Design a protein with these regions (language model features):
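Bacterial N-terminal signal peptides
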Residues: 5-14
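Mid-domain alpha/beta scaffold segments of enzyme catalytic cores
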Residues: 21-154, 158, 239, 279
Length: 310
């Protein structure tokens, strides 16, 4: 009898441990990936054909594999194309899997005559959660355009969010918008544009981060770490990034930091698993509630998304 029951007992224990491990894993929402199809007849405006790493179809079947391998439950796509029809193209592309592809940060040019029309139409789909400021038409005069402010006010009134790509915009720009429109939810992308060199963070950047973080409507994605590194392939040890990450943690705390990868651009610096390992290492000594907020709860709250279903 003992010989018969012993392997059964071991099997029950093994199943129990596996179930326990799965139940205690923290869900992950990746709030920053891009999808596109370079084989479309009309092509794509980004990435360029000269990009040997990124210029290939990047579609749901590719991210499905990445997310399953790395325990990513869901994602918010960020539209990298400046072509307006591509907003709907992405929504249609992912409609077969709404529990994995839960949101889209769209691409519409603020301050243009048709902005309102397109925003009204696209936001009828509840997965359309906001837009990203990427280009800066007019350069330094961009914020002198009254239409820009009217469109930003419209975003706030519609409870749509604003992601900001920190290449064309400064932290000071974000601070100005946040103060003028305190009801607009703003999310700075890619560690607030930090130049990461494996040494103490730039004092000017630190000062700007501390100032902008005083606005409660400003949040920050810890995303794009590999791209912000001054060396490629990107270092895989969290110590290289710790100076900037510590600044963001101290400034924004557990309630206003959000996880994103910037996949597939991450492939320039390393694998998805290597990227995720870096941010997990940084949060390893934080309490579980803070980890849960960073990896998924803050994203749900910021983008106004329903509870996870997978």
């Amino acid at each position: 009898m003992k010989i018969i029951l012993f392997p059964l007992f071991v099997a029950v224990i093994a199943v129990g441990c596996a179930t326990s491990k799965k139940s205690t894993a923290i869900p992950i929402i990746d709030t920053h990936i891009h999808l596109y199809d370079t084989t479309r007849p009309e092509g794509v405006p980004w990435p360029p054909e000269t990009d040997k790493v990124l210029y290939k179809p990047i579609l749901t079947e590719h991210f499905d594999k990445v997310s399953d391998e790395n325990g990513v439950n869901a994602t918010v796509i960020v539209e990298a194309s400046k072509w307006i029809p591509d907003n709907q193209w992405v929504l249609d592309l992912v409609k077969h899997d709404p529990n994995r592809y839960i949101g889209l940060v769209g691409s519409l040019e603020i301050g243009t005559p048709d902005f309102k029309k397109h925003l009204f139409q696209l936001s009828k789909d509840k997965r359309y959660v906001g837009i990203r400021m990427r280009e800066r038409p007019g350069g330094d005069a961009f914020f002198e355009n009254k239409a820009v402010w009217a469109d930003l006010q419209l975003l706030a009134a519609m409870d749509q969010t604003l992601d900001v790509l920190m290449f064309q915009y400064s932290i000071e720009d974000v601070d100005m918008v946040a103060k003028r429109l305190p009801n607009l939810k703003i999310l700075m992308n890619h560690v607030a544009g930090a130049d990461i060199e494996g040494k103490p963070a730039d004092p000017k950047w630190v000062d700007a981060v501390q100032k902008v973080a005083k606005n409660p409507n400003v949040h920050c994605k810890i995303s794009g770490l590999f791209q912000q590194s001054d060396r490629q392939p990107s270092p895989k040890d969290v110590s290289f990034y710790k100076s900037e990450l510590d600044v963001l943690w101290e400034a924004f705390g557990e309630d206003r930091l959000i996880y994103g990868s910037n996949w597939p651009v991450t492939m320039r610096g390393g694998t998805y698993a290597e990227y995720l390992a870096v941010v997990k290492a940084f949060f390893a000594d934080k309490h579980r509630a803070a980890q849960e907020k960073y990896f998924y709860k803050n994203a749900l709250k910021f983008y106004g998304l329903p509870p996870l279903k997978r």
